[in-house]
Amino acid sequence: MESDIRDNPAMSRFEMPLGDGALAVAYYSIEDGRVVLLHTDVPHELSGLGYGSLLAHGVFETLRRDGKRVIAKCPFMSSYAARHPEYGALLDG
C-alpha cells in the first residue's frame, strides 16, 4: 500500500484519501514549534485493514522530511512510533 498524505493546516490535520471521498486523518496542534499528534481517525468500516498504520507511516515520513519535532499524544501514533525506532529521533516528550 502506498500512501498519499497531505497536510491540511487550515483544519490542523494530515489527510490520506481512501477513495469514494473517505479520509483517514491525524489531527494535530502546534506547540512551541513542535507538532503534537492528538488523534487518529479511520472510518469505522475500514478499521483493521492497515490504513491507520499507513497513515502513521506517511505522517512520520512527512514530519521527518520537514525536519519537525513531534509529541505523540495520540495513543495510536505513540504506539506506532514505539514499534518503529527509526522515528525515535523525531520525538519529544
Please place each PLM-identified region on the residue numbering:
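A conserved beta-strand-loop-helix scaffold within acyl/acetyltransferase catalytic domains
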Residues: 26-35
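C-terminal structural segments of small proteins and small subunits
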Residues: 61-93
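Conserved beta-hairpin
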Residues: 12-23
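Conserved acetyl-CoA-binding loop-helix of GNAT-fold acetyltransferases
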Residues: 48-60
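Structural motif
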Residues: 8-10, 31
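A short, internal acetyl-CoA/4′-phosphopantetheine-binding micro-motif in the GNAT/acyltransferase core
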Residues: 41-47
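Residue-level recognition of conserved beta-strand positions in structured domain cores
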Residues: 18, 39-40
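Conserved N-terminal entry element of GNAT/NAT acetyltransferase domains
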Residues: 1-7
